[in-house]
């Protein structure tokens, strides 16, 4: 019978599996005890002969044999062979159990579709399922020793009630050398056809449903017969059995304790009893016994299939289904949860145990409170950032408002807040850049040239004049998508040499003393939803804060410079007015106004770079970011 130990291991505890070691039926001890006893007896005999019966010369010869066997014991690949063999046997055993044959579906379909409360309808239902179970009995008689002992002849099958005497006569009329498992199935199909003709089965579809379940049951039994007919090739079990037993026969010599003083392989400790070799014998021999017991699960081992119990279960249950269970559904009434919220009940003891319902691991993560909208944009693809054939085509953008119910009101982790808060951070950076530089509107739906399109004309700053060089080409000292700022040698200096206060756009001048240079401030300057801009924002967000800091430092230094220049000019003006008097005051004022316009401090003539230098490989990977040509 099958040894059931599921209750003993239902709860995992440190001593759970150790309790299984105390069981005898179906255990590893019962499987290997005989072989282990024989091996230990032979080992003891050889040890006694070596220690007492051999002279010194013979002992040296015996010790050399021990050394030879021990050094070459690894030549037998025991782990490899046992691993593959046990895997093949376990897979075969699992499939045989899946198709062993449970007749429940046939009983349910027959009770559902073979209608009628008459005695004739009842006989149709009972005989259809009984014939199917009769076929299973005939199959198990030929493949299971336990079932064969139960039903040694067909007369015993008739006596058990699975076959009627007149049915046995009809069965015996068919005489040929092959098995006749198909006969009961043919009888069952004939009954379904007759029931359809007499109207007991209401439609052809219902007849097909019943017949399909019978066919599935028959197919499973056919596969069981096939597996019994063609087992695993006999060479494989022979090879494994030979390897395991040969290995431990060699161990009888290889694992002997060498006690001679002059021996090179003298054992450090003479334990007399081979402890480690005994453990190895139990493991390897037990491993092989597992495969041996599962090789044919229809035998009489402790853990083989309970074919007789399955036959009893099937015939009892299926007759109950089609007879007493037929058309006896309870009256249709309102359930206890009618118009009420379902609240399952527990026993008082189990109600205190918390449950872990089926729920996504991140289903409780919500948006932070400071996120009010989410901008949905197409995915940026480096390989094809723009739509082929339409490089200026704008992508579809959707802004989704965030409902209060979608926001989190508690702390859900720093990582979530940081990742979702980047939207607000980018918006704040964009506003700072807009205030610092008077550039075109960032959200421009027209298809004109902007910073982000990488088509901005090259610009040049020289003193108080700035040129736009139309048609200039990119070179290695300039970039697009940039912020342009001129500064002095060092913002940390107290005074910066300059001659004018604010840069102005000039026309038509090229070739200044200090050629115009600029650098990248990242694509946050433009938010036109292009693929290049979206990709740069995500990759270069860490550069923004240093750039903003440098811009603010530059503005602060420029403001201090203008204040100092104006203070000096005011002092000079007051001194001159005191010297010349009131008569020439009006003329002096006019001259001073002109002088102030000429001497107004301009931005530093030496360019000041903002941003982080891009690598040469990155410039080549993005053609639209290649630097423009130098001014001539």
From Swiss-Prot:
<comment type="subunit">
    <text>Forms oligomers.</text>
</comment>
<comment type="function">
    <text>Forms chloride channels.</text>
</comment>
<keyword id="KW-0472">Membrane</keyword>
<feature type="region of interest" description="Disordered">
    <location>
        <begin position="562"/>
        <end position="632"/>
    </location>
</feature>
<feature type="transmembrane region" description="Helical">
    <location>
        <begin position="28"/>
        <end position="48"/>
    </location>
</feature>
<dbReference type="GO" id="GO:0005254">
    <property type="term" value="F:chloride channel activity"/>
</dbReference>
<dbReference type="GO" id="GO:0005886">
    <property type="term" value="C:plasma membrane"/>
</dbReference>
<keyword id="KW-0812">Transmembrane</keyword>
<dbReference type="InterPro" id="IPR000615">
    <property type="entry name" value="Bestrophin"/>
</dbReference>
<protein>
    <recommendedName>
        <fullName>Bestrophin homolog 24</fullName>
    </recommendedName>
</protein>
<dbReference type="Pfam" id="PF01062">
    <property type="entry name" value="Bestrophin"/>
</dbReference>
<dbReference type="InterPro" id="IPR021134">
    <property type="entry name" value="Bestrophin-like"/>
</dbReference>
<keyword id="KW-1003">Cell membrane</keyword>
<dbReference type="GO" id="GO:0034707">
    <property type="term" value="C:chloride channel complex"/>
</dbReference>
<keyword id="KW-0869">Chloride channel</keyword>
<keyword id="KW-0407">Ion channel</keyword>
<keyword id="KW-0406">Ion transport</keyword>
<feature type="compositionally biased region" description="Basic residues">
    <location>
        <begin position="623"/>
        <end position="632"/>
    </location>
</feature>
<feature type="transmembrane region" description="Helical">
    <location>
        <begin position="234"/>
        <end position="254"/>
    </location>
</feature>
<feature type="transmembrane region" description="Helical">
    <location>
        <begin position="83"/>
        <end position="103"/>
    </location>
</feature>
<keyword id="KW-1133">Transmembrane helix</keyword>
<keyword id="KW-0868">Chloride</keyword>
<feature type="compositionally biased region" description="Basic and acidic residues">
    <location>
        <begin position="563"/>
        <end position="602"/>
    </location>
</feature>
<feature type="region of interest" description="Disordered">
    <location>
        <begin position="491"/>
        <end position="516"/>
    </location>
</feature>
<feature type="transmembrane region" description="Helical">
    <location>
        <begin position="271"/>
        <end position="291"/>
    </location>
</feature>
<comment type="similarity">
    <text>Belongs to the anion channel-forming bestrophin (TC 1.A.46) family. Calcium-sensitive chloride channel subfamily.</text>
</comment>
<keyword id="KW-0813">Transport</keyword>
